[in-house]
């Protein structure tokens, strides 16, 4: 799969600027009683990451969330959000 992420670009300190980006992976089709999302650790697997001459990933971490929406108080929805 190919995933794309949008990052707000702030170039105040160009060319030494830093951006903080997020990528949220989850499902709206199946809730937490049907699908399990269990990351092996809080670091994403970057083994297939292709480096860019324009930027570097300095740090990347992920968190698992269990979200309850007002429409469905007894149904948890799961996601993993990576920040980099």
Swiss-Prot record:
InterPro entries: Neur_chan_lig-bd, Neur_chan_lig-bd_sf, Neur_channel, Neurotransmitter_ion_chnl_CS. It is a multi-pass membrane protein. GO terms for cellular component: postsynaptic membrane. It catalyses: K(+)(in) = K(+)(out); Na(+)(in) = Na(+)(out). Keywords: Cell membrane, Disulfide bond, Glycoprotein, Ion channel, Ion transport, Ligand-gated ion channel, Membrane, Postsynaptic cell membrane, Receptor, Synapse, Transmembrane, Transport. It comes from the Eukaryota. GO terms for molecular function: extracellular ligand-gated monoatomic ion channel activity; transmembrane signaling receptor activity. Pfam families: Neur_chan_LBD (PF02931). The record marks 66, 68 as: Confers toxin resistance. Glycans are attached at residue 20. Disulfide bonds join 7-21, 71-72. One of the alpha chains that assemble within the acetylcholine receptor, a pentamer of two alpha chains, a beta, a delta, and a gamma (in immature muscle) or epsilon (in mature muscle) chains. The muscle heteropentamer composed of alpha-1, beta-1, delta, epsilon subunits interacts with the alpha-conotoxin ImII. This is Acetylcholine receptor subunit alpha. The gene is CHRNA1.
